[in-house]
């Protein structure tokens, strides 16, 4: 990436030479315009021989040509603007070069007319100009003495004369201009490097963005498929839960990014330390060289001195981290706002890292340049013993300025590194504070289950009665402890204010631990509980060590304590699972015993029923003749009832057919009426209305027949109802009489059986009568609708049943006999007229 930045440092020079092979934009535009011109020529070459081709050329190809002209104008406009911009830049560059290097102005003028694509170095230009500017022998003697004087002047004198004649627009001398150009080029290089770093981070962030977007789309598709599969609606997440989830995710992302930036900072610090060692070595060499050359002991041996820090970085940040932030985070939305500020701080930190990387890269290059100059000066000192002290002093002064410049860059790197450390520490403090505050707010709004999962040490004895989600305990405890350890390792000074509270918490934890162990011994009496009780002595020793250590390493001790409690919890949960399985086995055994008892009881009931049926059948064999006669009547009524149900179901099913047929005809009729209102032609639509009219008349006739049959069925049902009531009265009277006549008397079982069958038939008969009456009402309503529809059709389209029949039965006169006056042949009698002569007699008067 640094090589790419170095290669792009002078890209402005090559971009100024706008040529076809070097400008990708211009080449693409030329290819695009060439393709468009070819397409436009093809459109213009077509000849409109027919009207269709001319219409196509006008309506289809004319807009294409117009769009081609517009696009060509836009392309020309863009090309002209780019040319105008580049010409201004070239003009400014030429004026600057002419003011700084006046002797190379003719060479650049020649380069403008050169058509070669490859850039030519200044050496080649000088060789070409020197070869081309060789003076030739003049044909005539020179009359102008000034011109002759200039011919014999040296080139250096001519250049000095031209330089003195040119006025500098910038107001700078040649050396100042060179220094300014060098400075600007270095700044450009730094900006190019920083740009490459920012570009790389942007590309990485963009790739991660699209990866997350793809993951979101996949999960959303899975959610949609599951909702469609199980017919579940969208699950609405509560605002508070959504804010907590988003805040937790943002804090996790910030934590990962801060860890990554912390690693980068450590790497940058190592690189800066290496660079500082090189600076100290170079300054020492420069001091020895200056002592050897000047001998006055004025060399600057102590170039770099590290700035003493009066206050630690943590104390500075602690002063800045005000208590107002803690007071302002009272609700979850306030915490969300603070998290947004933390995200902005992390983004600013990334920008600071990119600028720091550019400065470190510049520092390396300056150190390498300084080393090269010191080596060159040492070689020059060893090779030639010169007496020119002024020249050597000038070089040493330049070298000292170079060293001071490197020191300034190093100081700038150090300040930026301190600033980054300060921002990193503050971001870590914000992260730890916001994470703790978010957890405290979530714990306040939750029930006792969440409190128990977050504080598992306080009540271990209740583990046998309550079920805790294992995953929640592991996640909350481990993440909380990891975050506490990280924040404590990074910000140590924050623990000093909390030492008293920590000691109190540890004392409370020891008491709760002892109480929990005693409760655990009371509640758990299985062999597995020995594993927990054997750890009591080790836990007491551990608590003593925890109190002895004090604040240092309390997070590690608490983490180990939490892991032990979780281990105990898992063992207790395992014991509970085993007891549950035992209870399930006992319950299954009890259920099996109950099933066996139910089976035995059912067998006893079946035996009693068989005995009762045997007794009844024994009584049935001794039935009287009147009972047999009444039983035969009841059986006949049952068969008639079954036949009646079949007839009723067949007739009742036709009601739905009538309804659907009339609805369909109504729909078709409405379409025809709508078409009539739109077109206004009655004769053209009469042929479409006739089949509807005929079909509706047929349905009306069928409904009339159905009504007649249904009325007969209704009378039959009424007769059956009276018969059933008579039989029911006979049975009840026979059961009530206490006469000694054996012909009339019934047994209790047989009388109850006859009475039940007759009552069931009466209920069925009443239900059929009600449904039949409903069907009659519905068919009557349908007949009225059909009559109104037929009347409406006959009025609007002049249709009637007599007209249709007469038009069909009217004897038609052939067209041939009408024209040529021929008598038609006698029509033969059809088979239907022979079979039914009465129909023809009825139709004749209707037609007449």
Swiss-Prot record:
InterPro entries tied to this protein: NAB, NET2A-D/KIP1-like_C, NET2A-D/KIP1-like_dom
Domain NAB, chain residue ranges per copy: 10-90
Residue ranges, annotated region (Disordered): 108-141
Gene: NET2C
The keyword Coiled coil is assigned to this record: yes
Keywords, sorted A to Z: Coiled coil
Annotated TM spans: none
Coiled-coil regions, chain positions: 172-204, 241-278, 305-454, 752-797
GO cellular component terms listed in the entry, alphabetical order: membrane
Family according to the record: Belongs to the NET family.
Protein name in UniProt: Protein NETWORKED 2C
Single GO MF annotation: actin binding
Functional description taken from the UniProt entry: Plant-specific actin binding protein. May be part of a membrane-cytoskeletal adapter complex.
Keyword Plastid: no
Family annotation (Pfam families): KIP1, NET2A, NET2A_C
């Amino acid at each position: 990436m640094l090589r790419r930045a170095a290669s792009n440092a002078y890209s402005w020079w090559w971009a100024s030479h706008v040529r076809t092979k070097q400008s990708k934009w211009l080449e693409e535009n030329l290819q695009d315009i060439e393709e468009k011109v070819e397409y436009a020529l093809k459109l213009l070459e077509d000849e409109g021989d027919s009207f269709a081709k001319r219409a196509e050329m006008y309506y289809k190809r004319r807009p294409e040509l117009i769009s081609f002209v517009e696009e060509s104008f836009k392309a020309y406009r863009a090309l002209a603007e780019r040319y105008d911009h580049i010409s201004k830049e070239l003009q400014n560059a030429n004026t600057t070069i002419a003011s700084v290097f006046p002797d190379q102005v003719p060479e650049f003028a020649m380069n403008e007319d050169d058509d070669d694509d490859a850039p030519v170095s200044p050496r080649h230009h000088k060789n070409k100009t020197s070869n081309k500017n060789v003076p030739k022998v003049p044909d005539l003697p020179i009359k102008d003495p000034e011109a002759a004087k200039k011919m014999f002047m040296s080139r250096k004198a001519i250049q000095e004369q031209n330089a003195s004649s040119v006025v500098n627009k910038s107001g700078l001398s040649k050396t100042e201009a060179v220094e300014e150009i060098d400075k600007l080029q270095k700044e450009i290089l730094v900006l190019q490097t920083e740009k490459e770093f920012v570009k790389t981070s942007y590309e990485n962030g963009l790739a991660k963005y699209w990866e997350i977007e793809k993951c979101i789309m996949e999960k959303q598709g899975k959610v949609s498929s599951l909702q469609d599969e199980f017919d579940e609606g969208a699950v609405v997440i509560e605002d508070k839960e959504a804010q907590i989830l988003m805040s937790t995710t943002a804090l996790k992302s910030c934590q990962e990014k801060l860890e990554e930036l912390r690693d980068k900072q450590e790497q940058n610090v190592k690189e800066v330390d290496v660079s500082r060692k090189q600076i100290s070595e170079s300054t020492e060499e420069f001091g020895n060289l200056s002592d050897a050359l000047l001998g006055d002991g004025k060399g600057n041996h102590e170039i770099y001195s590290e700035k003493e820090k009066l206050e630690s970085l943590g104390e500075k940040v602690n002063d800045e981290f005000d208590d107002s932030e803690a007071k302002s985070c009272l609700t979850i939305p306030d915490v969300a706002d603070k998290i947004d500020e933390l995200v902005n701080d992390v983004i600013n930190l990334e920008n600071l890292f990119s600028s720091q990387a550019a400065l470190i890269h510049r520092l390396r290059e300056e150190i390498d340049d300084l080393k090269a100059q010191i080596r060159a000066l040492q070689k020059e000192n060893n090779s030639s013993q010169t007496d020119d002290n002024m020249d050597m002093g000038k070089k040493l002064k330049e070298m000292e300025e170079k060293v001071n410049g490197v020191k300034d860059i190093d100081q700038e790197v150090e300040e930026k590194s301190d600033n980054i450390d300060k921002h990193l520490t503050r971001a870590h403090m914000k992260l730890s504070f916001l994470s703790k505050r978010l957890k405290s707010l979530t714990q306040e709004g939750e029930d006792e289950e969440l409190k128990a999962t977050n504080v598992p040490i306080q009540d271990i004895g209740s583990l046998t009665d309550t079920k805790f989600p294992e995953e929640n305990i592991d996640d909350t405890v481990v993440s909380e402890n990891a975050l506490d350890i990280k924040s404590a390792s990074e910000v140590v000074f924050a623990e000093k204010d909390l030492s008293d509270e920590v000691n109190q918490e540890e004392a409370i934890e020891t008491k709760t631990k002892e109480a929990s162990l005693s409760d655990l011994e009371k509640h758990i009496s299985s062999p597995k509980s020995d594993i927990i009780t054997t750890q009591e002595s080790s836990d007491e020793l551990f608590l003593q060590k925890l109190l002895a250590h004090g604040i240092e390493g309390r997070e590690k001790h608490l983490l180990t304590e939490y892991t032990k409690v979780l281990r105990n919890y898992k063992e207790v949960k395992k014991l509970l699972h085993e007891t549950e399985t035992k209870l399930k086995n006992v319950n299954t055994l009890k259920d099996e015993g109950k099933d066996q008892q139910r089976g035995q009881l059912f067998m006893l009931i079946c035996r009693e029923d068989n005995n009762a049926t045997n007794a009844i059948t024994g009584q049935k064999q001794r039935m009287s003749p009147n009972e047999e006669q009444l039983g035969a009547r009841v059986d006949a009524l049952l068969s008639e009832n079954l036949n009646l149900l079949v007839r009723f179901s067949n007739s009742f099913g036709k009601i739905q057919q009538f309804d659907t047929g009339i609805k369909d005809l109504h729909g078709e009729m409405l379409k025809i009426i709508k078409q009539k209102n739109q077109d206004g032609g009655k004769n053209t639509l009469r042929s479409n209305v006739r089949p509807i009219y005929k079909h509706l008349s047929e349905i009306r006739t069928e409904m009339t027949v159905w009504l007649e049959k249904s009325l007969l069925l209704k009378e039959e049902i009424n007769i059956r109802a009276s018969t059933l009531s008579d039989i029911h009265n006979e049975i009840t009277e026979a059961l009530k009489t206490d006469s000694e006549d054996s012909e009339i008397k019934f047994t209790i079982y047989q009388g109850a059986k006859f009475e039940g069958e007759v009552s069931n038939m009466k209920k069925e008969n009443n239900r059929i009568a009600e449904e039949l009456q409903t069907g009659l009402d519905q068919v009557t309503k349908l007949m009225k609708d059909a009559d109104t529809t037929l009347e409406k059709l006959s009025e609007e389209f002049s249709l009637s049943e007599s007209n249709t029949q007469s038009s069909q039965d009217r004897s038609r006169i052939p067209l041939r006999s009408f024209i040529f006056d021929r008598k038609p042949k006698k029509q033969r009698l059809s088979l239907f007229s022979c079979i039914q002569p009465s129909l023809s007699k009825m139709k004749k008067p209707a037609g007449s």
